[in-house]
Amino acid sequence: MKRNGLRTVVVLALTIFLLNAPVCATASRLQDTCAEARDEVALRPEWMRILHDTLPICKISIPGSHDSGSIKGGHMLKTQATDIPAQLRQGIRAFDIRLEKKGNKLGVFHSHAFQDIYWEDDVLPAFIHFLQTYPSETLIVSLKKEGGELRDYASLLSVSLSSPEYQSYFVMDFRPELTLKDCRGKILFLHRDHAMDNYPGAACVGWEDDSTCLLTLR
């Protein structure tokens, strides 16, 4: 991942529309259990297919969801009406994933509330499966340590992001001139914590809440 290079400050100009609503999902897996909510939103699983390959990623308005996996915790913590697979089919392409060590895995959390889904078992496989089915699409995935020790988060995240079976689905090096063609069928990660060296995507270390992410390339 390029964190040093050009002496340029690049504002990541991805316009992300954050969608908030009550949630539905099962207690253990990301399954579709809320038919009414799904029916209310038109399915757009391949909307990026009609966009030109030469479009810079930073020039595309990309719909996203805030605390994308937040399915529990009461009215103060729930943020979504549909689970992540349903969001993917509805056209969401930017995801805000908050993780914390839970046992020997990374659980999805919103504040203190565990969402009964795991990064390794549920979320990342859902992303990969979607891209296998719809290779015209690209996903922007923000990863943040929601709690716990940084070393635990870093160790577990490194294992999943270093898995050989997933490497072809990751944008390995961020650069300002990335085009849609560069990213089709792949995930562009935005890392909000310096968890490890040489991880895929872009470093947004120091990205505070309610602020803009600035990527500094020297």
Please place each PLM-identified region on the residue numbering:
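C-terminal active-site rim and adjoining tail of enzyme catalytic domains
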Residues: 190-218
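Bacterial N-terminal signal peptides that target proteins for export
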Residues: 2-10
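Long, acidic (Asp/Glu-rich), low-complexity accessory segments flanking structured domains
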Residues: 26-90, 101-133, 138, 197, ...
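Loop/turn elements at helix/coil->beta-strand transitions in domains of secreted/extracellular proteins
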Residues: 90-93, 134-140, 166, 184-186
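Acidic, His- and aromatic-enriched active-site or binding-groove loops in soluble protein domains
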Residues: 161-176, 180
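Bacterial N-terminal signal peptides
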Residues: 11-20
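Hydrophobic faces of well-ordered beta-strands that scaffold small-molecule active sites
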Residues: 60, 95-97, 139-141, 189
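Active-site beta-loop-alpha junctions enriched in small/polar residues
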Residues: 65, 100, 144-146, 192-194
